[in-house]
């Protein structure tokens, strides 16, 4: 055992994406978290501190290291070795933004270790480059709600910090990999279908920006881009939608690629919906979440706390 000083911690919220028809462009932060505690060390080492991340690679084949190295390489710098304790309650491969949170944390890790002073736009671009789209990553980076578009040379984003809604999630204990969820989607749409699907998405975005939650819910349920094709992968979706509607929920949708199912309901009514869904779906985890205002948060240890490490 050796001693090393704690340098800083990085906390990143999880996220949901799509909200129905906002496919690959609408993301919202959720109050599940990934936390990195970073210590000075003589070699790279990652240690899991929660069951969710118990299988993470301990060395430089870790996604967090690989992403941080890409940032360092871009700036022509070399990452100093650190020991990283990793804690998370964002379940993997469940549609709650676990990979996006890790990518955002990794970018901030490089930013802090190398004192890069990256701008928000740079962070969002890097995260979107790795993820392929800005929805989950942008929500985790900034908190609140994000609507975005990633292009080859720029990422565009519109942000809404304060989202006054309760979010109840039903999390099945099986995984749905993003690749499998994308494989069930059609290669293309007819012109007529594309126009209809885009119109639904446009109204969703307008309703989100004005926080017209009944209209948001209506559009969530009218998605034509992906949910009609993914219901076969998540049989609980229609059942959750039915139970939630009886309790007055605004709308229900897959969270990202699933299998997590997300329901929006008036602030203060989420606990009642959570209890009802827990009774109806005992084989799933059911949780009441909020939409955090803050995205990634860095805290430097003011007392240079000393920890025992390997």
Swiss-Prot record:
InterPro entries assigned: GHMP_kinase_C_dom, GHMP_kinase_C_sf, GHMP_kinase_N_dom, GHMP_knse_ATP-bd_CS, Homoserine_kinase, Ribosomal_Su5_D2-typ_SF, Ribsml_uS5_D2-typ_fold_subgr
Keyword Lyase recorded: no
Reaction catalyzed: L-homoserine + ATP = O-phospho-L-homoserine + ADP + H(+)
Entry keywords, A to Z: Amino-acid biosynthesis, ATP-binding, Cytoplasm, Kinase, Nucleotide-binding, Threonine biosynthesis, Transferase
GO cellular component: cytoplasm
Recorded GO MF terms: ATP binding; homoserine kinase activity
Location(s), subcellular: Cytoplasm
The protein, known as: Homoserine kinase
Species: Bacillus pumilus (strain SAFR-032)
